[in-house]
């Protein structure tokens, strides 16, 4: 699809959905196959329908149109923060940790770059064309440059031995980050996973059937709703900035998003230890508990407790 065709499709979709979208209703944001350009078209078409500029109707926009600094790398940064938080709890030194990342799009490439900057050794990366392994560490900067100069593909990257995606998933590493598609880890390959820690950069990369297999093997898995929440968090920051008419610095965005993810991880980890359950189940409990307490306050059946200040 050409750029002009994609723009016409995006604008037609917005025309059909403009009553559903809104800065206080449903707010679209980028995901696979979309980015700042599509968000700009959507915002522009929505604004035309409303007769005024409404930049808070979407997030992930170009910065010149009200986008937030730190949004592009936000999901990958959240994966990095979650990974380091988990390694700390597991008493694994990041400077001695090996990492394999399946998927080298926005999330995977940023996670690789940020983890390498913090001392981890990224030994394997992959995309849809296959993977590359280097026991001494992939040169992440060169891999990103190669991808950018090769239409977004890692194909023919010279920085490591060629491997398959399945080989990457079953490598003996400290950290495995599935950052591609859903149902990457299933009951068919879960028994072959050798990583000590899985951090879900993608949405739903582990099937329901694979979860108990990983648990039985003692593999810690940071669930997607926690690990890749950085993008949603900074999207919220962008919306706040649009509504207030303020611009935050990159350091402020990083500091606030990192703090939220660390606090959420520590809360989920504490619940998992208290009840001897997986981090995924603990994350669901934390989320449901917060919603439940909110409803009980609203209907008058609950009274304020001191620990609610930290929730």
Q: Which residues does each PLM region occupy?
A:
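General beta-strand structural signal in soluble alpha/beta enzymes
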Residues: 25-30, 52-58, 124-127, 177-178, ...
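Adenosine-phosphate binding glycine-rich loop
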Residues: 86, 193-310
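Rossmann-like adenosine-cofactor binding region
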Residues: 130-221
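Glycine-rich phosphate/diphosphate-binding loop of Rossmann-like nucleotide-binding domains
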Residues: 58-62, 66-73, 77-172
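A glycine-rich phosphate-binding loop feature that marks nucleotide/adenosyl-phosphate handling sites
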Residues: 29-39, 59-62, 96-108, 129, ...
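Flexible, glycine/charged-enriched surface loops at secondary-structure junctions
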Residues: 21-30, 54-56, 90-98, 272-284, ...
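Glycine/serine-rich phosphate-binding loop and adjoining beta1-alpha1 elements at the start
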Residues: 1-94
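Short glycine/serine/threonine-rich phosphate/pyrophosphate-binding segments
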Residues: 107-111, 183-185, 206-208, 229-231
């Amino acid at each position: 699809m050409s750029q002009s065709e994609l723009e016409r499709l995006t604008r037609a979709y917005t025309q059909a959905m403009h009553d559903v979208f809104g800065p206080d209703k449903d707010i679209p944001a980028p995901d696979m196959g979309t980015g700042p350009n599509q968000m700009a078209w959507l915002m522009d078409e929505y604004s035309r329908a409303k007769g005024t500029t409404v930049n808070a109707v979407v997030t992930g926009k170009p910065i010149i149109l009200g986008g937030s600094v730190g949004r592009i790398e936000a999901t990958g940064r959240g994966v990095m923060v979650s990974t380091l938080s988990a390694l700390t709890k597991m008493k694994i030194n990041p400077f001695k940790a090996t990492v394999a990342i399946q998927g080298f799009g926005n999330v995977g490439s940023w996670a690789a770059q940020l983890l390498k900057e913090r001392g981890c050794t990224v030994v394997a990366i992959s995309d849809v064309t296959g993977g590359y392994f280097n026991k001494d560490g992939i040169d992440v900067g060169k891999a990103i440059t190669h991808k950018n100069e090769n239409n977004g593909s890692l194909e023919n990257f010279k920085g490591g031995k060629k491997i398959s995606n399945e080989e990457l998933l079953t490598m003996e590493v400290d950290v495995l980050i599935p950052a591609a598609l859903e149902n990457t880890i299933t009951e068919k390959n879960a028994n072959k996973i050798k990583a000590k820690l899985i951090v879900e950069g993608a949405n739903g990369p582990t099937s329901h059937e694979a979860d108990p297999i990983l648990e039985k093997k003692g593999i810690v898995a940071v669930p997607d709703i926690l690990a890749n929440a950085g993008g949603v968090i900074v999207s919220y920051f962008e919306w706040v900035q649009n509504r207030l008419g303020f611009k935050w610095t990159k350091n402020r965005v990083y500091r606030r998003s990192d703090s939220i993810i660390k606090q959420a991880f520590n809360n989920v980890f504490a619940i998992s230890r208290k009840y001897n359950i997986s981090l995924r189940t603990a994350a669901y409990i934390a989320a449901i508990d917060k919603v439940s307490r909110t409803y009980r306050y609203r209907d008058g059946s609950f009274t304020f407790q001191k620990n609610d200040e930290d929730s």
